[in-house]
Amino acid sequence: MADGLNRVHFNPSTAQLVEFALLRGEGELTANGALVAKTGARSGRSPGDRFIVREPSSEAEIEWGPVNQAFDPGAFEGLWARVEAYLADKELFVSDLEVGADTEHYQPVRVTTQYAWHQLFARNLFIIPEEFNRKDKPVWQIINAPDFVCDPARDGTNSDATVILNFAERKVLLAGLKYAGEMKKSMFSVQNFLLPAQGVLPMHCSANVGKDGDTTLFFGLSGTGKTTLSADPKRFLIGDDEHGWAPGGVFNIEGGCYAKCIDLSQKNEPVIWDAIRFGTVLENVVMDKHRVPNYKDSSLTENTRAAYPLEHIAQRKEDNCGAEPHAVVFLTCDVSGVLPPVSILTKEQAAYHFLSGYTAKVGSTEIGSTSAIQSTFSTCFGAPFFPRPAGVYAELLMKRIESFGSQVYLVNTGWTGGPHGVGKRFDIPTTRAIVDAIVSGELKDVETVHLDTLNLAVPVAVSGVDSNLLNPINTWGDKALYAEYAQKLAEAFTKNFAKYQVSDAIRNAGPKA
């Protein structure tokens, strides 16, 4: 894309990008100063349109299938060239950014976008380095052309839009998509492929650190509480979604947060609330006539979002890094109402539940989801983003846990007293009290009760939590019905886990069907 043929804005500031977005009709300002943009029909990720170029350098290391769909190298070259030609006479926005807040494990990336608000999103979510690419690594390229219309017959895509990763050429192509989350998740997938070869575990998790330097990780799918629980006024945020765990410490892969906004309240989520101001991008958030965001309005999508830089959070770890974690929390949203609010896991149970990734899609981030809430097993708590076989990541997790001695907990942010529609969801204050007990060390070496069917150890008391909530059978009026649902869930775990080749110790660490 030659600079002389179009107007190219290099490393534009936040204020410039907001001005461009408003002048070009890409969005509107809200009363709190944020820029709100709409993404149209695709208000979430499009997993059916995501591909990886099948080429010799990476072919043998990728787990090909419905998640990692193969794309022909020649077809990619043709489509990349067509998109470049399409953008040749367009006004463009370009930034040199980095992915990975670690001096050894970062990846430099040049992001070219057709929309100003997409560039603002990229500058909020990726890292703006003081000095770009200090180690002179080969630079990745992202091109995002949302107004380009793909032709499946001509381009080899599945629809009029696509996301394609090319590891050999270090290129990411996004075409026909306005949903900005595709940009951040594409580079997350890149790091998820590259980091294991460097002995680093990439993780779909949030992370924070206490005043004494103790790090806690929160794994979970979108909507299970990663962002909410890591944004703790008593602790310092490292990041809310993507991290690497290397020998010696953890680091944020990003430079910002991408928080779900549905039902956001100042009372329950003050850190996120205060971060939404000038420079923040709001996706698909509805405003009233006074331009005040209505976070309860899901008329455009359940998957409303706020994208803001970490600088918008007062209590944050400024280097985006932390020590190795003392506590690791697996967040599961159990729609059956069977799992306890907190369980203490052995390292074998940690491997079992990491591979299982049992949870729910809560206001799914994927387009085409027919139900707002549905149970799912998502390997590594992020199956759509991990190109390598699941065992690679599970082995790295076990290695890191054993090496450092981290304690792993399973925390249910879903339902109790009955399944979704009958029981009630654990409220945020209850889950926060549980997390407080975890990070304080209160739950180490405590008295527990064993739930035989689920094969889980549950503490008999947690400060600030009604003890009746801790054993889920106590919250069900019909105890026999609870036992029936628990057995069904155990059978679902066993059926899902049958595909994994693991040791007997790990297999036997799961529920007992």
Swiss-Prot record:
GO annotation (BP), single: gluconeogenesis
Residues reported in the UniProt entry to bind ATP: 185, 204, 220-228, 269, 305, 431
Annotated residues for binding of Mn(2+): 185, 204, 241
Pathway named in the protein's UniProt entry: Carbohydrate biosynthesis; gluconeogenesis
Catalyzed reactions per annotation: oxaloacetate + ATP = phosphoenolpyruvate + ADP + CO2
Enzyme Commission number(s) from the entry: 4.1.1.49
Cofactor(s) this protein cannot do without: Mn(2+)
Record-linked CDD domains: PEPCK_ATP
Main localization (coarse): cytoplasm
Compartments reported by the entry: Cytoplasm
Keywords: ATP-binding, Cytoplasm, Decarboxylase, Gluconeogenesis, Lyase, Manganese, Metal-binding, Nucleotide-binding
Positions annotated to bind substrate: 45, 179, 185, 305
GO MF terms, alphabetically ordered: ATP binding; metal ion binding; phosphoenolpyruvate carboxykinase (ATP) activity
Bound cofactor: record note: Binds 1 Mn(2+) ion per subunit.
Gene Ontology cellular component annotations, sorted alphabetically: cytosol
UniProt feature coiled coil, ranges: none
Entry function: Involved in the gluconeogenesis. Catalyzes the conversion of oxaloacetate (OAA) to phosphoenolpyruvate (PEP) through direct phosphoryl transfer between the nucleoside triphosphate and OAA.
UniProt-listed NCBIfam families: pckA, PRK09344.1-2, PRK09344.1-3, PRK09344.1-5
Protein family (similarity comment): Belongs to the phosphoenolpyruvate carboxykinase (ATP) family.
Name by which UniProt lists this protein: Phosphoenolpyruvate carboxykinase (ATP)
Organism, scientific name: Shewanella baltica (strain OS223)
